[in-house]
Design a protein with these regions (language model features):
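Short nucleic-acid-contacting surface segments enriched for D/E, G, S/T with interspersed K/R
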Residues: 300-314
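Phosphate/pyrophosphate-binding loops at sites that engage ATP/ADP/AMP, CoA/4′-phosphopantetheine
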Residues: 65-83, 102
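Conserved catalytic cysteine-centered active-site region
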Residues: 1, 97-130
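Active-site-proximal alpha-helical scaffold in enzymes
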Residues: 1, 6-8, 14-19, 122-140
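Conserved hydrophobic positions within beta-strands
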Residues: 263-265, 298
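Cys/His-rich short segments
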Residues: 204-262
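Condensing-enzyme catalytic core mediating Claisen C-C bond formation in acyl metabolism
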Residues: 2-58, 62, 66, 146-149, ...
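OB-fold/S1-family single-stranded nucleic acid-binding modules
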Residues: 307, 315-332
């Protein structure tokens, strides 16, 4: 379907503060109108939509034009004052044919790439991911108009400060995430990952076990990938432990984050027996630069390319589901 080629999976998070900011919010405008075009209930597997012409003419194009026109008036801005215009869309075609930019006086050069060829429509995260992509190329003083759409829209009038140069290239952002993406080998693997098909026979998987009290006690290691660094000898270990395995000092440590630390494969195996949607199941032990080792499952990898000493990065992924609770952990 068209949705399969246009939709994508992704998330975005921004840190909000009032000191030393890279981007200033100089104004916000919102417009709401009761309009149903696309929907999905909690238990629905697929997104549903009304007839496309009605959705685009009476909904998407009309509501975006009203929202952005009013936003420009509210903050006393002209289209030529804006460096980049960011607006999401439910499909690549809808974004390309959107009538709002021309109606409001924007040029094609001002429109931010919607990432459909690289990531796709990730839903709520889509405009924020487009913003991150714009900030990777932004210069101090640039003005960005960030627009979200749903039964109307919200417009953020943003100004880039000189602090942006300290962030560019130091975060994964869009560029680095896209650079490490792996293509699925075939359409069947996609359907399997989505749970849309099942195998003719699959051995029963082990029943996952999770302890919520333990997950809470070790939340810094599980959620934030924190290890401990001994204050006396400098030994780093994972997960956080009270006793140093090298000098045996007790409670003499500082927590250190390993999530962004360069790492390499120490050893690995290929498990063809354990049930998995992406065989073989690849387990590895990873050594972090400066100390620390973790055993974990590998993701986004080609089993034929694995080798000892291969550089890897850590990613936070869905691990398993138990009693209707989704648990997350780190993979390499």
């Amino acid at each position: 379907s068209g949705a399969e080629s246009d939709f994508g999976d992704g998330a975005a998070a921004l840190m909000i503060g009032n000191e030393n900011v890279a981007v200033e919010i100089e104004g916000v405008y919102s417009y709401t109108e009761e309009f149903t075009d696309r929907w999905r209930r909690a238990n629905d597997q697929f997104v549903k939509t009304w007839e496309e012409r009605f959705v685009n003419t009476q909904g998407y194009n009309r509501l975006l034009t009203i929202t952005v026109t009013n936003a420009l008036k509210s903050v006393n801005l002209k289209p030529q004052d804006v460096t980049k215009l960011i607006y999401p869309a439910h499909s690549k075609t809808a974004h390309t044919r959107c009538t709002m930019p021309a109606a409001c006086g924007f040029t094609k050069a001002q429109i931010q790439d919607a990432l459909f060829d690289r990531i796709g429509n990730t839903g709520v995260a889509h405009p924020l991911q487009m913003l991150v992509a714009a900030l990777e190329e932004a210069k101090p003083g640039d003005r960005i108009l960030l627009v979200s759409y749903s039964d109307g829209g919200v417009v953020f009038n943003l100004r880039v400060t000189d602090k942006i140069t300290g962030l560019q290239g130091n975060r994964r952002g869009i560029k680095k995430h896209v650079a490490t993406m792996k293509d699925l080998p075939n359409y069947g693997r996609y359907l399997l990952f989505r749970g849309l098909v099942s195998r003719e026979y699959e051995a029963p998987a082990p029943v996952p076990y999770a302890s919520l009290p333990r997950e809470w006690r070790e939340r810094n290691s599980i959620m934030s990938l924190h290890g401990s660094k001994c204050r006396k000898c400098g030994e780093v270990q994972f997960p956080v432990e009270r006793v140093c395995p090298k000098c045996l000092s007790k409670d003499e440590f500082d927590e250190v984050s390993l999530a962004q630390t360069p790492a390499k494969i120490y050893t690995y195996n290929k498990d063809f027996a354990t049930p998995t949607s992406d065989p073989p199941n690849s387990m590895c032990q990873v050594d972090f630069e400066g100390g620390g080792r973790i055993q974990c499952i590998m993701a986004d990898r080609d089993p034929n390319e694995l080798e000892i000493g291969m550089p890897v990065e850590m990613v936070f992924r869905r691990f398993h589901e138990e009693t209707n609770i989704i648990h997350y952990y780190w993979k390499a």
